[in-house]
Amino acid sequence: MKKFERLIGEWHGEGEVSMEPPMKISVEAKIERLGEFIVISTVGEPAEMPDSVSIIGGAPDSEPQPMHYFDARGVKRLFMMTLEGSTWKIWRAPGEDWNGPHGPGFNQRFIGEISADGKTIDGRWERGTGDAGDQWGIDFPINYFRK
């Protein structure tokens, strides 16, 4: 979990969801250690960006870490997370809640690039479509700034 320590701190995120009209989003995120785990808590605006908490860890350090996500809507999801060099990746765990384009879930991933000085993360959430959920498009970009 040591490689994730560079994410620890308080962050402000800004992005925009492509819809009519476009929806600007704002997120306050706090990333901290809890023993051998990492906890991410977020407060989002507008209301469509639900407040959430995620608990990361439990796998050997050489493997992707499970990320258990819970939000104010009652949604719970299992993601996997890695940090390789400056690239932070989060993706839905294989088979987790994905039942094709008409199912209750959807395939989703985050890719973020951490700046050399560690003060910004240029990121985007992507959504998988198609019968296998493997045709990727940008769901929304979001950039984080260390407070």
Which functions belong to the PLM regions below?
Residues 9, 62-63, 118:
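A short, compositionally biased
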Residues 1-10:
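N-terminal helix-cap/turn-to-beta initiation motif at the start of protein domains
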Residues 120, 124-147:
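Edge beta-strand at a domain terminus
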